[in-house]
Swiss-Prot record:
Domain of life where this protein originates: Bacteria
Family, as annotated: Belongs to the UPF0260 family.
Pfam families: CxxCxxCC (PF03692)
InterPro entries named among the record's database cross-references: Puta_zinc/iron-chelating_dom, UCP006173
Coiled coil ranges: none
Identification of the protein by name: UPF0260 protein Atu0932
Organism from which the protein derives: Agrobacterium fabrum (strain C58 / ATCC 33970) (Agrobacterium tumefaciens (strain C58))
């Protein structure tokens, strides 16, 4: 029988109670946060593009210079406790949002599966679907608007790795 001490940290701790290491480990490596977004100034609506940050590795979906990212990308949004509660564009599969809302992580999250590849195998990540902002003029970002970052998790809990 599992006790609270046996349960994983994301089931027993709130985001505010997590250590720095636990907080960082919640990132599932999907890369969706690092896609450029456009905001309608009149309505405030935010849409995703398939244009990724220059530092996001398109294959691993991890930042290529995480420790120094703000030196290269000064407007990089560092997800913290305050922002998790304020940002309305977090993908529905985001572990930070799930834990914030008292939900469990999906089967494909590496903390559950034990394998960092399951986020890609489940089709949740940005792998193979993006272009670097280094190759797209900012005036052309509207040509890259996509909705899949908001729909990738619609069936995330239905199938499991075989």
């Amino acid at each position: 029988m599992l006790t609270m001490n046996d349960a994983p940290f994301w089931k027993t701790k709130s985001l505010t109670e997590m250590t720095g290491e636990e907080w960082e480990s919640l990132c599932d490596g999907c890369g969706l946060c690092c896609l450029n977004k456009l905001e309608d100034w009149d309505t405030g609506e935010v849409v995703f593009t398939s244009v990724r940050c220059v530092l996001l590795d398109g294959e691993s979906c991890r930042c290529s210079d995480y420790e120094n990212r703000r030196a290269t990308v000064p407007d990089c949004i560092q997800l913290d406790l305050k922002k998790v509660h304020e940002i309305g564009w977090l993908p529905p599969t985001c572990a930070y949002a799930l834990v914030r809302d008292g939900k469990d992580l999906y089967w494909w999250h590496y903390l559950v599966s034990g394998d960092i590849e399951t986020v890609h195998e489940a089709g949740i990540s940005a792998r193979g679907r993006t272009v670097s902002e280094a190759h797209v003029d900012v005036d052309d970002f509207e040509d890259y608007v996509v909705d899949w970052p908001l729909t990738v998790g619609e069936k995330a809990g239905e199938k499991q790795r075989t």
